[in-house]
Each structure stands twice: as C-alpha cells, then as structure tokens.
Amino acid sequence: YGPVFSVWLDGACGEGPNGKVQVYDWQRIYDTVRALAPEAVISVCGPDVRWCGNEAGSVRANEWSVVPASLREAERTAEKSQKADDGEFSRQVASGDEDLGSREALADYCGPLAWYPAEVNTSTRKGWFHHDAEDSQVRSVDELFSIWKGSVGGNATFLLNVPPNRHGLLADADVEVLARLGDKVADFRSRRIDASRVDDNDDVTLCFDAPRSVSAIVLEEDIAQGQRIDEAVVTSSMNGEEDREIARVHCVGYRRIITLETPVTATQVRVTVTKSRQGFYLADAYGIEA
C-alpha cells in the first residue's frame, strides 16, 4: 500500500450493546504512530492537523495556522469543544469558530499557541459511504473545484472522501468526476502568467511582458518562517497608469488563491503587505490567465 502518510482520528465513539462507551488512550495511539510511521501526520484528534469544523467543504474567509494550543484537545470531547481554563484564559475554543487566529481573536489570550494547520474534509457524495441509489448524485466537478480552490487556496489541506462500493471498487460516476477535477486543476496551474518580480520593502510587483487578462492571483508565504501576513492589498495597472485596487485579503499562509469577480487586463500587478507580524516572507506570487 505504500507509506502511511496520514492517520485520521475523528473521535467517533458510539456505545456498545451494553451501553459502555470506549475510552481512547490518545497518547498511546500517538506514540505508536510516531514509532511506526514517524513521517505521518496525525489529524483531527491529534497534534498535527486540525479539523476545519465542518464536513461540507466550507472554508473560513481567513484561515490561520497559529491558533490556541487548546484546539489540539478540542475534538477529544463529546461536545466537540474544549474548555480552556488555566487561570489566564477562559473561554470555549471550538474547531468551528469562524476566527481562530487573528489579532482580534488572540487579543485577550495569554495561553500557549500552536502551529496547527487546518484540513478541509468532505465527500464526493452527500455522505461518507457508497449507496447505489446515489450514483446520480455525485457532486459536480465545478462544486469540487470550488472547494479545492477554497481549501488548497485558503491555507488548508484538502481531504476528499471517495467511497468504494460493496465490491471494493470506485463507482464510475465518482471516477469520472475525479478525472474531470484533475483536468480542471491541471488547467488552472497551466495558466500561470510569466512575470518578472520586483521586491521593494512592503511591495511585491509582478511585471508582464504584455497586457494580460488576469482572473486570479496566487500568494504563498514561506511558512518555514511562520505565517505573518495580516493584510495585503492587490492592485493592477496598465502601462504605468495609476494602480487600482482589485483585492484585499487578511491572511495568506502557505497558499492563498484570490479569485477575481471579474478578470482585469493589466501589465502589472502589485501586492502591498499593509499589516504583518514582524515582517513577511512571500515565497511566491503569480497571476492566473483568464
């Protein structure tokens, strides 16, 4: 089967016929994974990757990887939240909270922080298991592509469940939509616009060799240096004319795909970081052709 790269622990714990509820020895599970598959990440009820808070494929407008460390405990409780009460900070910290890591969310927080990036998880169908009657209800490629852009392009990882049927095979409907999704992702990546890059303090300017129709901007921080950008303004211009604002975001992370409502024609796109946490490291920035 190849190497184990992820161990997904969702915390589900139903009662047995005698009414007894299983109690998990979480630390023993973690220690076993670390010993047998040290490169694997432990997700959801684990210390490495957190649940985004829903199973619909919805994403936050601004996803932070630096969050209260108590979120590492959040999914271990039956009510799916963890009460943090250490004398310095007392509030309910839940995976589904809309704002987990902004300056405002952390303003009164005195507890420890953790690098705990999010995972968006959903299914090709309305549920996690295969039912023959749902073969005509597989999600459309456009919907899945939108979720991909929002998650992978929103500083989160993306887990897409594809349920096998009773024969251990993937249904033709799922296979078809996956192939089409792969084509759309490949097409998106192939439309990267070649540009020269000029860095000047808080500005990163992309200069095109000719007017280009831009439908999206992709920004990527060097997360080895942390997640630092609090706000960035994107502007465009034609042949040295005055810049006009086309987008504004409040965090970036390892990747932020900014899809423009209407493509813009430009010879230059500038990203200005207006707020950051002790500077920033923008590893990559590029436009996507319409």
Model-predicted segments: where are they?
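Short, conserved beta-strand segments of beta-strand-rich sandwich/propeller modules, principally
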Residues: 268-270
